[in-house]
Amino acid sequence: MTAAPTWWVYLLRCGDGTLYCGIALDVEARLEQHRAGKGAKYTRGRGPLELVYREACHSRPEALRRERAIKRMRRSAKAALL
């Protein structure tokens, strides 16, 4: 039996200093998509993008719950994660 793939919750720091939170199976590949302008609309035109945080989750639903929780945090709480 193979292990379930690991989902990741990640934070990117955009060139304008804002933080973007998302989920992915392959964070490095997703970062390249963002950098190529093929990621979320929010990150387009806000480069350069830097990966500043990632957290492993056991399932997609768990990753989505954690992403939602992080997005609801104040900026100071997000900064404490870093």
Language-model features: where?
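GIY-YIG nuclease catalytic motif and its immediate N-terminal context
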Residues: 1-71, 75-82
